[in-house]
From Swiss-Prot:
One of its GO terms (cellular component) is ribosome. One of its GO terms (biological process) is translation. This is Small ribosomal subunit protein uS15c. It comes from Sorghum bicolor (Sorghum). The keyword Ribonucleoprotein applies. It is found in: Plastid, Chloroplast. Keywords: Chloroplast, Plastid, Ribonucleoprotein, Ribosomal protein. It holds the Pfam family Ribosomal_S15. The lineage of its organism: Eukaryota, Viridiplantae, Streptophyta, Embryophyta, Tracheophyta. Belongs to the universal ribosomal protein uS15 family. One of its GO terms (molecular function) is structural constituent of ribosome. It comes from the Eukaryota. Part of the 30S ribosomal subunit.
Length: 78
């Protein structure tokens, strides 16, 4: 029963990138309304950096998983 509830691996690179992408999109829409919210902008930049480092790691380790992930999340390749 516990294994059924925990289908996704929350520690996987894909799940972490997915989570960061959701947070980034939410913060970006917030910043469109609140242009002078500089602390949220700083948080957005930190999340972008974390996601970029994870994607670089995944690209180095497994290029196929990397390509599949960026196509699913509609992220530009750097």
């Amino acid at each position: 029963m516990v294994k059924e509830e925990k289908q996704e691996n929350r520690g996987s690179v894909e799940f972490q990138v997915f989570s960061f992408t959701n947070k980034i999109r939410r913060l970006a829409s917030h910043l469109e309304l609140h242009k002078k919210d500089f602390s949220s902008e700083r948080g957005l930049r930190r999340l972008l950096g974390k996601r970029q480092r994870l994607l670089a790691y995944l690209a180095k380790k497994n290029r196929v998983r990397y390509k599949k992930l960026i196509s699913q999340l509609d992220i530009r390749e750097k």
